[in-house]
Amino acid sequence: PMNIAVLGMGHLGQAITKYFNGKGLKLKITAAFDVDPEKVGKTIDGIPCYHMDSFEEVVEDKDISIVIVSSPTKVAPNLVLPIINAGIRGVLNFTSTPLNFPQGIIVENYDITTLLEKVAYFVKENEENPTDD
């Protein structure tokens, strides 16, 4: 399996780990990272949670190639350099701040707010201009 880490173990990070845990996919969340002393050093949904200070070391030890960023939006830009330095090859970013990486690192910025606004826009359009099928 391809090993994944979750950066930020708030509500979203924990929901992501719960969702993927035990799915039997070829993707496996093997580590989580946070800075909250209440979370660091604990196992959350079967996944060990490390402090961000040990990010590069854990990524190397666990052969992690993809990260899911679910940190607070204001923290997300500070994660770019550690992600690059650790040799991560893929990023799924769930924050509302688009993250930019050098060529060679695959990035998917997934802003749920923007997507919801898009859906709301089209719902409103359909209500204002109903089509007769």
Region annotations inferred by a language model:
Residues 8-13, 41, 87-90:
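Glycine-centered flexibility sites
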Residues 1-26, 30-36:
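Glycine-rich adenosine-cofactor-binding loop
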